[in-house]
Amino acid sequence: SYRFGISGNYYVTSKLSIRAGVDYTKLDSSFGRGRGLGASISIVFQPSYRDRAEARYESSTDSQSLSYIHNSSNQIGSLGYGAVANRDNGAVNAQGFADYTANRFDATLSQATYGPNFKRFGAVNVTSIRVGTSIAFADGVVGVGRRINDSFALLYPHHNLDGRSVVAGQSLAQSDYMSKSGTFGAAVNGYLTSYVNQPIQYDVQDVPPGYDIGAGSVRVNPPYHSGYKLRVGTDAFASAMGTLLLPNGQPVALIGGTVIAEDGKDKEPLPFFTNSVGRFAIQNLRPAVAYRVELGGGAAMFKFNVPSDTTGLVDLKTITLKPAK
């Protein structure tokens, strides 16, 4: 037995293409189909990377097919659907499906119909519904999410975020995330791959101005079928900003220094610097703590307090250094 053929593609536009070919098949067995010379043609329309429609015909097997598929983005609330119809040597079958991605589960509905010919199309019908979910545990943290194939991470908010939701994914914008914390526990990222260095991205819903949630990404290298817990937020979440002036009213421009907690609980001082007009911003501050800023190796300094009830941003307005004695 052998088969050889040739085919080619022609792009009418960037979205529409035609594929055609001819082939010759010789089979030793008398039970095989598609002997001799045959031809095939297919027309493909793909308006986006998620949508594809195709019509196809093969003369050697006397088969035709027509399909349209819209792929889900796997984001929360996304919907995928499609339909395929085939006629093969007289037999006819068709299938339609839809899948939905929710925060805590995914679901698929499909309907398939078959008939030995057009007159008896619908003689066999199969309907299926599938719902997939998971309950994940990691060091005392629980989350309900979609199916987990390998490793996972549970993301939950620090208590000072006052119940705001944490999302696993790039951003809350346009639902660009895969899971969200809430009533049924932590946000579940169930798409980690074992033994691969990869980022876990996160964001916080309605985060208060000035609240420092961190880099928005943590890199991990999971062992086989492992789980992580990741708390989003910290005790040192506040940020302070203001303008620093000299006694004569001129800005303290382009100067560096250190920020030291008066309670002595910080392992290392925080960095401090001003821009060309004396503006500064300090991150990773703790509420109800007094701080001392030392400039230029301690030649000058000033102090400020972070209120105990701050939600994130502390506006220090304008600070004027005291004249040197």
Each predicted region: which residue ranges?
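C-terminal tails and terminal domains of large nucleic-acid-associated
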Residues: 281-284
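Short, small/polar residue-rich loop motifs at catalytic or cofactor-binding pockets
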Residues: 266-268
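Flexible, glycine-rich linker and terminal segments associated
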Residues: 1-260, 273-275, 287, 292-325
